[in-house]
Every structure is written in C-alpha cells, then in structure tokens.
C-alpha cells in the first residue's frame, strides 16, 4: 500500500477546517467547552498536515499539540509553543470527568471568545506554513 502525501495532507486540512467552522458555530450558541475542544482539534489536524508535509510520513497518534509541533520540524516561537501547551488542556479538560466541571466553569463567554480568537489566529499562522 502506497502512502499518498498530498491526499493525506488534504484529508487533515479538510477535517481541520470543518472542526474550526463547527467550533465557531458552537461558540455562537454558547457551547463554550465544546467550541474550545473543536478549536484544539482543528489545530491538531493542521499540525498533523504539517507533520505529513515535512516528514513524508503519517502523523503520530497523539493529541499533544506541542509534540506535533516538534515533529513538524518548523521553527516556532516559544510563545506559540506555550499557546499549544495551553490549548492541549482544552482537549483533556473537556473530555475527562475529573477535569470537565472545572473546565465548564472556566469556559465563560469572555474566556472562550478570547481563546477561540487566539486559536483562529494560530490556525491561520500554521496554514501559512504549508
């Protein structure tokens, strides 16, 4: 079985865009924790597309954004790595019961809109690296 790099990159990017748009929709109806979770997924998938592009290999099975960033071999400012570390928490906190309720309380309108805007900006920055 051959590995089609371009097809795999397209798969990750199409899926990332869908997740980002769905996250925006959830933000509008005030489903804040899930909007942030999908924002995380969108970043994860763009990073996976970058991993495939730079390594010509399948992206690893992980949700850790900082690990994926490292695997892209793309120079990223420390501030972006810090953001990725923060957004990885959106995946964990929105899914696991011990963390879920605290995350729901933290996910206010102001917090969620600010973080989702940051995610969109980072998404755009990452897309430009393709």
Identify the meaning behind each predicted range:
Residues 1-130:
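Terminal alpha-helical segments
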């Amino acid at each position: 079985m051959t590995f089609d790099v371009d097809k795999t990159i397209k798969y990750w990017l199409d899926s990332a865009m869908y997740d980002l748009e769905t996250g925006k929709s959830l933000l509008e109806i005030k489903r804040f924790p899930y909007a942030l979770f999908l924002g995380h997924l969108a970043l994860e998938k763009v990073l996976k597309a970058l991993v495939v592009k730079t390594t010509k290999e399948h992206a690893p099975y992980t949700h850790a954004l900082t690990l994926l960033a490292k695997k892209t071999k793309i120079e990223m400012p420390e501030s972006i790595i810090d953001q990725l570390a923060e957004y990885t928490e959106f995946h964990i906190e929105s899914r696991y019961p011990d963390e879920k309720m605290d995350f729901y309380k933290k996910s206010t309108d102001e917090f969620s809109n600010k973080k989702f805007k940051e995610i969109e900006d980072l998404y755009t920055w990452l897309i430009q690296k393709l």
